[in-house]
């Protein structure tokens, strides 16, 4: 009888101990999941903060009317610098987020690595954009405090080759970063050929026609060509342009980089086969480069400035669009990776302490 009672007591003790251990295990599991969910909340909050900061810093900078008549060339540099600064802040915040993710408790290691990989990829793209924007900002700054569309003395001036080269390279790098991120770059519609600089009233005469000085009417024609130019086609012309030293344009010159190098007395047929897009592209190249200025009659001074401002805003607008799409594409990839973070009952510490001889079953759940 006594042995039976002892056996019953022992059985009850074992049952109670088992229940206690189970309750403790369930408590620890619940605490682990709570810690995991707390980590997810912090990660999510950090990601939302990045979106907020980016929108706040870039919201005012991005747009299709970055400059206006009377603004200096350096204003374009300020525009690029503001966007670059915003991307730098975003890149720094992504690094902080990566550190937070590394500290996440009870998270499946492979899903954590997927997020960190997405962040690293985005950071590389942002760095490429920042470098390109810095290059463009520095070039515009070096162009000085000359007004956009400067034609004060009615004598054309060639854009410096080094400046034009830097602009072309900067635009190419931005497009390269976008394409790397899966953003589609359009070619646009370049438009029909426009009249060459045979007459002083032709649009291209402001480059330095065969009489060296444009006369009244050329400015209005140039403004008209720029107004109908497709921004995507302008970007394509800039991307494929080749910089040149200051020259007197020969007949048939139509490359945007070469047109921007016109310094005086162009051939009567200079600009043959040029179109609205190429006209706008060399206007932009001249406005961001040191030395670039136009020939215009006094009565056309305002029209030439308006044409230059319009060309600059069209290019800035499409570049801003490309940058925004590129940034959004990379942040969306990070967002999807964050959504894929899974819970794991096995922490890195647990795995280390268990030793190599004992295989570990990694239990994961969404």
Curated annotation (Swiss-Prot):
Keywords: Cell outer membrane, Lipoprotein, Membrane, Palmitate, Plasmid, Signal. InterPro entries: Borrelia_lipo. A lipid is attached at residue 19 (N-palmitoyl cysteine). It is a lipid-anchor. Coiled coil: none annotated. It holds the Pfam family Lipoprotein_2. A lipid is attached at residue 19 (S-diacylglycerol cysteine). The keyword Lipid metabolism does not apply. GO terms for cellular component: cell outer membrane. It is found in: Cell outer membrane. The keyword Isomerase does not apply. Residues 1-18 form the signal peptide. Genes for both Vlp and Vsp families are on (usually) unnamed linear plasmids in B.hermsii HS1. The Vlp and Vsp proteins are antigenically distinct proteins, only one vlp or vsp gene is transcriptionally active at any one time. Switching between these genes is a mechanism of host immune response evasion. Belongs to the variable large protein (Vlp) family. Beta subfamily. This is Variable large protein 10. It comes from Borrelia hermsii.
